Amino acid sequence: MDKFYQWEGDDLRLNILGTPGAKQTKIGKVRGNQLKVSVSCAAEKGKATACMIKFLAEQFKVKESDITLVFGLTSINKQFLIETPKRLPDIIKS
Protein backbone atom coordinates (compact mmCIF):
# COMPACT_ATOMS: atom_id res chain seq x y z
CA MET A 1 0.00 0.00 0.00
CA ASP A 2 1.31 3.43 -0.95
CA LYS A 3 -0.90 5.27 1.55
CA PHE A 4 -1.62 4.30 5.14
CA TYR A 5 -5.08 3.10 4.14
CA GLN A 6 -6.76 1.29 1.28
CA TRP A 7 -10.41 0.70 0.54
CA GLU A 8 -11.46 -2.86 -0.26
CA GLY A 9 -15.07 -2.45 -1.26
CA ASP A 10 -16.80 -1.09 1.85
CA ASP A 11 -13.97 -2.23 4.16
CA LEU A 12 -10.90 -0.22 5.13
CA ARG A 13 -7.38 -1.64 5.44
CA LEU A 14 -5.28 0.51 7.77
CA ASN A 15 -1.51 0.48 8.45
CA ILE A 16 -0.66 1.66 11.95
CA LEU A 17 2.53 2.68 13.71
CA GLY A 18 1.56 2.08 17.32
CA THR A 19 2.91 3.81 20.41
CA PRO A 20 2.02 1.95 23.61
CA GLY A 21 2.25 3.49 27.08
CA ALA A 22 1.53 7.02 25.83
CA LYS A 23 0.16 9.78 28.05
CA GLN A 24 -2.92 10.04 25.84
CA THR A 25 -4.77 7.71 23.48
CA LYS A 26 -5.03 9.53 20.15
CA ILE A 27 -4.58 9.47 16.40
CA GLY A 28 -1.39 11.21 15.36
CA LYS A 29 0.21 12.14 12.06
CA VAL A 30 0.95 10.07 8.99
CA ARG A 31 4.48 8.66 8.87
CA GLY A 32 5.27 7.19 5.47
CA ASN A 33 2.63 4.56 4.75
CA GLN A 34 1.49 4.32 8.39
CA LEU A 35 -0.82 6.31 10.63
CA LYS A 36 0.58 6.92 14.09
CA VAL A 37 -1.80 5.85 16.85
CA SER A 38 -0.85 6.21 20.51
CA VAL A 39 -2.53 4.27 23.32
CA SER A 40 -2.15 4.67 27.05
CA CYS A 41 -2.13 0.90 27.71
CA ALA A 42 1.13 -0.88 28.40
CA ALA A 43 2.74 -3.09 25.77
CA GLU A 44 2.46 -6.45 27.45
CA LYS A 45 0.80 -9.61 26.18
CA GLY A 46 -1.25 -7.81 23.52
CA LYS A 47 -2.89 -5.34 25.94
CA ALA A 48 -1.90 -2.31 23.86
CA THR A 49 -3.32 -3.94 20.73
CA ALA A 50 -6.61 -4.66 22.51
CA CYS A 51 -6.69 -1.01 23.66
CA MET A 52 -6.02 0.12 20.10
CA ILE A 53 -8.87 -2.01 18.73
CA LYS A 54 -11.25 -0.52 21.30
CA PHE A 55 -10.10 3.02 20.41
CA LEU A 56 -10.36 2.41 16.66
CA ALA A 57 -13.85 0.95 17.10
CA GLU A 58 -14.90 4.19 18.82
CA GLN A 59 -13.27 6.35 16.13
CA PHE A 60 -14.83 4.46 13.21
CA LYS A 61 -18.17 3.82 14.97
CA VAL A 62 -18.02 0.03 14.59
CA LYS A 63 -18.07 -2.90 17.01
CA GLU A 64 -14.70 -4.21 18.17
CA SER A 65 -15.58 -7.48 16.44
CA ASP A 66 -15.71 -5.56 13.13
CA ILE A 67 -11.96 -4.91 13.38
CA THR A 68 -9.54 -7.67 12.39
CA LEU A 69 -5.85 -7.52 13.21
CA VAL A 70 -4.14 -8.67 10.01
CA PHE A 71 -0.64 -8.61 11.51
CA GLY A 72 1.34 -7.07 14.37
CA LEU A 73 -0.11 -8.43 17.63
CA THR A 74 3.11 -7.75 19.55
CA SER A 75 4.71 -5.27 17.15
CA ILE A 76 4.40 -1.51 16.77
CA ASN A 77 3.79 -2.13 13.04
CA LYS A 78 0.20 -3.26 12.66
CA GLN A 79 -2.42 -3.67 9.99
CA PHE A 80 -6.14 -3.72 10.67
CA LEU A 81 -9.13 -4.44 8.46
CA ILE A 82 -12.17 -2.42 9.51
CA GLU A 83 -15.49 -3.73 8.23
CA THR A 84 -17.78 -1.03 6.84
CA PRO A 85 -16.70 1.96 8.96
CA LYS A 86 -19.63 4.20 9.90
CA ARG A 87 -17.47 7.30 10.45
CA LEU A 88 -14.05 8.40 9.19
CA PRO A 89 -11.56 10.44 11.19
CA ASP A 90 -10.62 13.74 9.53
CA ILE A 91 -7.17 12.46 8.56
CA ILE A 92 -8.79 9.89 6.25
CA LYS A 93 -11.42 12.28 4.87
CA SER A 94 -8.73 14.64 3.57
Language-model-derived ranges and their functions:
Residues Q59:
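C-terminal catalytic core of tyrosine-transesterase DNA break-rejoin enzymes
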Residues M1-I53, V62-E64, T68-T74, K78-S94:
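Contiguous, often N-terminal, cationic amphipathic patches that form binding interfaces
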